[in-house]
Amino acid sequence: MSAAQSPTAQHAHAEDPVVQALFARFGQHVFVAQATHTGMPVLWLDREYLLEVLNFLRDMPEPFEMLFDLHGIDERLRSHREDLPPADFTVFYQLMSISRNRDIMLKVALSERDLEVPSVAGVYPNANWYEREVWDMFGIDFRGHPHLTRLLMPPTWNGHPLRKDYPARATEFDPYTLTVEGQSTEQEALRFDPEAWGMQRQSENTDYMFLNLGPNHPSAHGAFRIALQLDGEVVVDCVPDIGYHHRGAEKMAERQSWHSYIPYTDRIDYTGGVMNNLPYVMAVEKLAGIEVTDRAKTIRVMMAEMFRINSHLLFLGTYLQDLGAMTPVFFTFTDRQKAYEVIEGITGFRMHPAWYRIGGTAHDLPRGWDKLVQGFLDWMPKRLVEYERAMMENAIIRERTKQVAAFTTREALEWGVTGPNLRATGCDFDLRKQRPYSGYENFDFEVPLGANGDVFDRGQLRIDEMRQSLRIIQQCVDHMPAGDYKADHPLTTPPPREKMLQHIETLITHFLQVSWGPVLKPNESLSMIEATKGINSYYLTADGNTMSYRTRIRTPSFPHLQQIPAAVRGALVPDLIAHLGSIDFVMADVDR
């Protein structure tokens, strides 16, 4: 691949052992290195080498077992592409190695006249949905894909929304109308066609029944449909159908300033609250060169763990409800109310505080915050004991969950499973330990693990995680650092209020950053966190402007739903419901 490499990029990757192995196997001329703030090697290559390179990385000693993310970028309006190969569009592949505890990103440059790249679904099975989404959003063709169809948009949709020439506002479209004929067309387009998915309507001994579970079903946990192929009560196969909750979150980031996009992050996993803010603001802080104060880091950790408990309580109640236990959800919601009282007392809001800021938090901790938090810490441990005794030790629940919808660590990694669902298989990988961020390296806590990767382990593990979250929060209360809640940096947005009220320069900066937005230098950054449901990451592309050129949001729930057919083939329908309850997803996290 021909492109001049900057000395910075060459130096950034020269000593990396994986890059050296690639250079030794394929030749340095095949790759172009890019210097970024992503924290991993970034290499461009021609598409004819893609499959061979991916196979090499997957099969090497200490392999890259997981395709963590795959998506695209419309490069046509990007102003700052110095030292990068010519490209109208880019497809990127982020690979993760659990054994090496490191990532690598590969990029393929494409011309608008030839938007085609080979499918990698034969190398990494979870590439299937990612490639469908890239085709849906950008119109890039993946040669050899088994079923390249719309994923998030309706089957009848025209255009590819993440292209730069596609409108970003509803006011740029004609007023929406739906005629009777149009409604019939849309309904017919949603009719499930088994043959299109390679399914048979009958076997030698039976006629299969096809059943829609959802998109409006209590156990679907949102607007979500699964088309089931059934032999009696046995699930022969199934096809998850997503997109009903798609809101264009990545597109909206292209018309919001770095600061004003924060409230949108709250609503990706709407049960995670400020946990969603964290990877975004950390990625922006990398671009801005902001080092957050120890106090701000600790406050962020404390509130993130509060929302982890809050989310896990919601999971526990609905998980048990899906198994037929109707009472527990009322107990867990009582505890969630107590958590919300703490959250509201500190941030001023409940579900969607949008409280983290570029450089810190919206304001400092209020007077009496420690007593408020301590009251919750004193309350919860005995409740977790009750949940375990009354529910997880219940013989009926154990019978319904043990060895049901089990999968191995290898299978989990192949499908991109992260978080508690991965750790339930016995895989000891938690970003808070393996790649500490926001000061997690200063906390003493354990990472709970399962053994069987089944429905029971996924439930028990989240109870154990709540205990560890309480342990972390207690350390925050006992050792909260003194100091500022915001960094003293020109790009901290908004600037500290005390300085804004006393210095005209800071007042001017405040006005510009809030009304127009901070200007960040061209570069790319990526931040990953251990969110409530798994690993959540934001990959940001800055082009020297007040807003993001491209924002890629990788959520944990998306690959978890793609794995459903592999986990439940041969199971009974009630076991499918148990599995759905155990993987802990919300559709806003899937569809974005």
Swiss-Prot record:
Q: Which reaction does it catalyse?
A: a quinone + NADH + 5 H(+)(in) = a quinol + NAD(+) + 4 H(+)(out)
* Broad class of the protein's primary localization: membrane
List the InterPro entries hit by this protein, alphabetically: NADH_DH_suC, NADH_DH_suCD, NADH_Q_OxRdtase_suD, NADH_quin_OxRdtase_su_C/D-like, NADH_UbQ_OxRdtase_30kDa_su, NADH_UbQ_OxRdtase_49kDa_CS, NDH1_su_D/H, NiFe-Hase_large
Q: Does the keyword Cell inner membrane apply?
A: yes
Question: Which cysteine pairs make disulfide bonds?
Answer: none
Q: Which UniProt keywords apply?
A: Cell inner membrane, Cell membrane, Membrane, Multifunctional enzyme, NAD, Quinone, Translocase, Transport, Ubiquinone
User: Where in or outside the cell?
Assistant: Cell inner membrane
Region annotation (NADH dehydrogenase I subunit D) maps to 207-592
Annotated GO CC locations: NADH dehydrogenase complex; plasma membrane
In what way does this protein cross or attach to the membrane? Peripheral membrane protein
Give the record's family classification. In the N-terminal section; belongs to the complex I 30 kDa subunit family.
PANTHER family in the record: NADH-QUINONE OXIDOREDUCTASE SUBUNIT C_D, NADH-UBIQUINONE OXIDOREDUCTASE 49 KDA SUBUNIT
NCBIfam families per the UniProt record, alphabetical: NuoC_fam, NuoD, PRK06075.1, PRK11742.1
Q: What does this protein do?
A: NDH-1 shuttles electrons from NADH, via FMN and iron-sulfur (Fe-S) centers, to quinones in the respiratory chain. The immediate electron acceptor for the enzyme in this species is believed to be ubiquinone. Couples the redox reaction to proton translocation (for every two electrons transferred, four hydrogen ions are translocated across the cytoplasmic membrane), and thus conserves the redox energy in a proton gradient.
- The protein in question is named NADH-quinone oxidoreductase subunit C/D
From the broadest rank down, the organism's phylogenetic lineage runs: Bacteria, Pseudomonadati, Pseudomonadota, Gammaproteobacteria, Oceanospirillales
Per the record, the gene is nuoC
